[in-house]
Design a protein with these regions (language model features):
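Zn2+-dependent metallopeptidase catalytic domains
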Residues: 1-147
Length: 148
């Protein structure tokens, strides 16, 4: 199975459980982690102005894909437990956990979220977008980002 046909990388509709095999897991997760790391690296760089479109949107899009794919893997691991799937899950869980942990303690991103909330444009955002920003700040706090 190649990256183009991997059902874990098809976000056009509901998950294609019927096309899933344990061999899909590592290539898909590695691809999504690489994409997420690239987005994070780009967003860590200095920005003239932190905006929803240039900061939150790309981060949310990248991490949503990873979360969705990993959610499918976790769900299937819980309901269709096979030795092959368990091995794929156990192989990838440390990588996924490491990414989410590092993201939650990323001081550069934390500062950008704080800047976005402090900006005068924050009040003009939709309630849903303000909630996403507030939840991100809460998650950084719970992850220990503001302990240093």
């Amino acid at each position: 199975m190649n990256i183009q046909t991997n059902p874990l990388l098809d976000f056009s509709d509901l998950p294609r459980f019927d096309a899933f095999t344990p061999e899909c897991v590592t290539p898909a997760i590695d691809t999504l982690l690489a994409e997420c790391r690239d987005v994070v690296a780009r967003l860590e760089a200095p920005m003239d102005q932190v905006t929803w479109k240039d900061f939150v949107e790309p981060l949310e899009q990248a991490t949503e894909k990873l979360g969705r794919a990993w959610g499918v893997v976790g769900h299937l691991n819980a309901v269709v437990d096979t030795p092959e799937l368990r091995a794929a899950y156990n192989e990838n869980q440390p990588k996924v956990t490491e990414f989410w942990t590092a993201l939650g303690q990323n001081l550069a991103l934390f500062e950008k979220y704080k800047a976005l909330k402090a900006d005068a444009g924050y009040a003009a955002l939709t309630p849903q977008r303000r909630k996403i920003i507030d939840n991100a700040l809460r998650d950084f706090h719970l992850g220990g980002a503001d302990l240093s």
